[in-house]
């Protein structure tokens, strides 16, 4: 689930549905526990990159971190196969960071999550094997291959040496990759097929565990069926026809790849050291430092394009003076929104109002305390409290975050 601020609530809904399905299939009291225990999936749950890059946050960082670590602790006990977080460099890169910053800021955020979990009383090997990562695949082929190799090496060292993790699974950087949406151009959109293919190949040769390839027309519109199918076929051809998946780390040993890997590790480690000196990722974000670094890199990248110091084919060179085609307009079906609103009103009217009120009061009490919030969230959704109502209670307790003003 690509969800962050309300990630704990959405996970609670999944668990509630699993329990309901278990009850429907069996009267065995232990069936609910077994089914919940066997749930598999991933919730993105990476709130720090929202403050740093994307902006879809609600609560202040310290309260958001509490929700993240509560998910870690709950899943360790009740859903041990669930991937509790997908720590995301993708959005950081899309906001304009460099490859080095993508690695550094992603791993700095990961360090903050691990430290938060340890401070909450968890043992590192109880939750670290379920941490997952999400990276961008950008245009510089060799740099991208080296980036993944450097990140994997750095994470193993961080977990083994900094956090004293003993389980080799805790050292593993398991990651998903998506080709860079910000690299797609509205001009000559068919060129994006080539860009996406090269980016996908870099991620595969860098060792990604899973991959999303963008549609070539996504700079213009939601992808058409043709574009989505071609994106899928790109992956299938790479996987089945060209042999790159037959060898682990196929570019390992290359002089330039090893040099770039070492250089990215060195420079990213220096950035992490600086973030540590500021008090960690949360402090760096609250000070606006991480955001400012990304903004500066984004400005520099765009300036290079405008000065033709960085060539983008079809944009600032090799143009054909063609008019940019407009994409097909996405039309919102207002009937869908109307029906959902009516369903919500009906739901609220038929539920037990006293029970709902009691559950919301209990949620407020738990949120103000220090006990794990997940059992209460599950009870709330099972009792008919809506996502919006849960959010309202948590806003009342935690407040809403206002970022620092940067000039």
Regions flagged by a language model, labelled:
Residues 1-138, 143, 162, 169-176, ...:
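Catalytic alpha/beta active-site cores
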